[in-house]
Amino acid sequence: MSRQARGRKKKGSKKTLRRSGKQPEVHCMLIPTDQELLLLPTSTMAEVVDYQNPEPMPDAPPWLLGQVEWNNRQVPVFSFSALINGTGTTEVSDKSKIMVLKSLSVSTRVPYLGIVLRDLPRPVNVMEEDIRETGDEKKSLGVFSRIQVEDSDAIIPDMDRLTHLVTHAAFGALPITQLDS
């Protein structure tokens, strides 16, 4: 095949891709925390396990429930709702679970985070046009955006911030108690 023929073929395939305009679906989970519904890509999820009482951590804020052992690691477990709303934690039920999430930390200190769920998460495939921002400007620690997806209000968490908050709370660094201005 000549260089010109190869060039035309490449151009043609690029045009086809551009013309189709299809955006890829993102495989996500709708995650029912104790009071909120979260939307996260499945790639952030390591495993969902039955709820077990976390071992308390000294001087931890109320939203950091303690840590559980998972795959021979100590994983800090927190209540997302208590963190963002500044409230106490809610009661756990026999349906409660802990979702182990991959943290975004490059540190090996907290490679995973545990978040309390009221029930099992539900898979959902999402495209950009499926998500609508609600316009709720309420600022909360650990919240990237408040959205509506599949006729449900949900939160896209700020995983960087959550990792930072949990790491600091779990290992005694200076507490973070308010939003940056």
Q: Which positions does each model-derived feature cover?
A:
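An acidic, low-aromatic, low-complexity terminal/linker signal
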Residues: 1-181
